C-alpha cells in the first residue's frame, strides 16, 4: 500500500518530523484567493474557453472534530458519507486541452447558510469581475436551475447540463400540458439532432435544445 498523505512525508525527508508537518497543515490556509493567484501564473484564457461547476466530498469518515465535516450526499459513493463538501470552479482551455482550478468554496450551510448554488453564483460573479473569458459553461443537474440557466443565457453563453428525469418540459409549443422529461417521445431525427423544449418556469420564449444521451453509471 502506498501512503500519499502529507504527514507521511516526514518518513522520507531528513530533519522533518511528524509534529512539524502536522502543525503546518493545521495552520496553513489555502484560501480561494491563493488558488486564484496561483492559477494566474499559468492560466491561459481563450475566447472559446469553458467553465465547469462541480462539487466533491473529501471523505472524513473517521474524523469527528474537524470544522466543516458533516453527512452529505456523494455522487461517487452514491449515498451519504461523512466529509467536507467542496464546490469547485474549473477553467478549461479547449485549444490547449488544459484545466485550471481557479476558485472553490467549502459547502458548510450550518456555518454560513449558503447553498451550493449560492457558492456557484458568487464564484461566477467574481470570475466575471476578474475578466475570465469563456464561451461555454458545463454543470451538473444540481446547478441546472431556472435562475442559473437564465443568467448564463442572458450573458450570451452556451451551457450544457443534464436535466432530471422528473423535470417538467413542453415540446408541443403549448398545445399540450407540461410533462416529465422521462415521459417524452422521440423520433429518430430527434434522437440524432435533439429537440426544442420549454422548461416549466422559464420565460415564454426561452427554449432549450434537449438531447437524449445514454450513459453508464
Question: What name fits each language-model region?
Answer:
Residues 1-31:
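Gly/serine-rich nucleotide phosphate-binding loop at the start of the catalytic core
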Residues 5-8, 50-53, 101, 136-138, ...:
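A structural signal for short, well-ordered beta-strand segments and their strand-loop junctions
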Residues 19-23, 74-134, 213-217:
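Electropositive, glycine- and tryptophan-enriched low-complexity nucleic-acid-binding patches
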Residues 25-96, 205-206, 211:
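Active-site-proximal, Lys/Arg-enriched surface segment
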Residues 61-67, 100-103, 149-150, 171-172:
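Short, conserved acidic/polar surface loops in the N-terminal third of protein domains
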Residues 76-79, 149, 197:
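A generic local secondary-structure boundary/capping motif
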Residues 97, 102, 110, 158-217:
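An anionic, glycine-rich sequence signature occurring as long contiguous blocks
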Residues 109-174:
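Domain-level cores of phosphate- or acyl-group-handling catalytic modules
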Amino acid at each position: 500500500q502506498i501512503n500519499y498523505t502529507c504527514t507521511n512525508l516526514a518518513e522520507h525527508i531528513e530533519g522533518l518530523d511528524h509534529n512539524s508537518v502536522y502543525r503546518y497543515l493545521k495552520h496553513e490556509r489555502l484560501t480561494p484567493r491563493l488558488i486564484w493567484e496561483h492559477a494566474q501564473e499559468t492560466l491561459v484564457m481563450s475566447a472559446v474557453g469553458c467553465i465547469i461547476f462541480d462539487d466533491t466530498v473529501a471523505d472524513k469518515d473517521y474524523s469527528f472534530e474537524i470544522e466543516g465535516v458533516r453527512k452529505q450526499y456523494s455522487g461517487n459513493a452514491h449515498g451519504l458519507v461523512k466529509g467536507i463538501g467542496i464546490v469547485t470552479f474549473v477553467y478549461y482551455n479547449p485549444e490547449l486541452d488544459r484545466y485550471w482550478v481557479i476558485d472553490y468554496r467549502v459547502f458548510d450551510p450550518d456555518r454560513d447558510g449558503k447553498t451550493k448554488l449560492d457558492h456557484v453564483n458568487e464564484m461566477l460573479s467574481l470570475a466575471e469581475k476578474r475578466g475570465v473569458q469563456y464561451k461555454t459553461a458545463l454543470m451538473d443537474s444540481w446547478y441546472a436551475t431556472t435562475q442559473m440557466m437564465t443568467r448564463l443565457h442572458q450573458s450570451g453563453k452556451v451551457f450544457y447540463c443534464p436535466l432530471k428525469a422528473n423535470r417538467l418540459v413542453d415540446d408541443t409549443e403549448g398545445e399540450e400540458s407540461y410533462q416529465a422529461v422521462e415521459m417524452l417521445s422521440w423520433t429518430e431525427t430527434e434522437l440524432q439532432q435533439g429537440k426544442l423544449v420549454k422548461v416549466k418556469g422559464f420565460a415564454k420564449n426561452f427554449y432549450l435544445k434537449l438531447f437524449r444521451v445514454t450513459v453508464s453509471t
